[in-house]
């Protein structure tokens, strides 16, 4: 679920964009196997595609893989995603409404968070928010790695958790509630969005 009412997003005007499907990088070969849709990789982390979905993989930008269709940028920077769109139409998507593992509000990139900075600062001044924690980083596939989850569960109730990268999948199923209408867990994106988290930290310092 993309946060529109809280922070707004240009993506929210796209009726066909519903949100995020899937979890950490190491699960893609299982999660994509039965996904009735094409998959577009724009950055890390691409694993060697399994035969069950290899014909649905597209890449663009800095990521590519032998045998997969790569969408190149035109001289003006534009990209033609017509082949991907046609593949999506062919596959048709889910035949009926399908629940995955749950619903989690996302879309808190640095521009979105800084767009409501006044609300956040007011909550701090009023004592509703005592501190911010950035819990970000990649995560391995080994079961039992619980540091991220333990940390977040023990964080004070008046704290906000900014998170990014695959480490978030260790705890983003937790319902930590909200503070002043803001979710206590704010998903800022993937590894590549670490710079955005730094910008938010500096702005709110």
Walk through the language-model features, giving the residues of each.
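Single conserved hydrophobic/aromatic residue that forms the stacking wall/gate
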Residues: 1-8, 12-13
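Structural motif
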Residues: 3-4, 31, 124, 153
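Generic structural signal of hydrophobic/aromatic residues within well-ordered alpha-helices
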Residues: 81-88, 113, 120, 151, ...
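Catalytic or ion-translocation cores adjacent to nucleophile or general acid/base/metal-coordination motifs
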Residues: 10, 14-79, 140-203
